Amino acid sequence: QRELKLSAEGIKKYEQQTYYAGNWKPEYDKWVDMLAGLNSGPGHKKVAWNSALIYDMIYSQPVYYELPDLRVPTTLFIGTADTTAIGSDIASPAVKAQLGHYEVLGKEAAKRIPHARLVEFDGMGHAPQMEAPEKFNQALIEDLEPK
């Protein structure tokens, strides 16, 4: 039901807080328009259902304990100001204060994944690929180059 009520205004507010660490640039509007369009277009009920399934998976199937089992090359691209946390909008203030600290979570996840590489984007939120595409692309290309 929550997904059926999404609006462009709500999406922008959420993305500004989490994706862009409180900042906003006009070039981010297209991503809000895309999500708002998906959530208001003719397929909006399917989009909402798929989103609900993703939320259910996140809530009911944590994978943190499985990170040490990864055997593929893994690079984590993390914005240190990311505060994304599923459920933070319905959490109590005390619980919310403990969620979404990616400056810590990124390092913890990288330690748990064998041979993981952590690339941090200082001061950036959940979407460094959109916030600073040149910087992100350079880091990605460097990571993909043969060692």
Briefly describe each language-model feature range:
Residues 22, 74, 117-118:
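Secondary-structure boundary/capping signal
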Residues 40-112:
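Conserved serine/cysteine hydrolase catalytic core
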Residues 39-43, 124-127:
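Intrinsically disordered, low-complexity regions enriched for glutamine and histidine
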Residues 32-33, 53, 88, 127, ...:
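Residue-level signal for alpha-helical context at structural boundaries
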Residues 1, 89-93, 133-136:
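Short, glycine/charged-enriched secondary-structure capping and boundary segments
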Residues 19-20, 40, 114, 145:
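Residues at helix-coil transition
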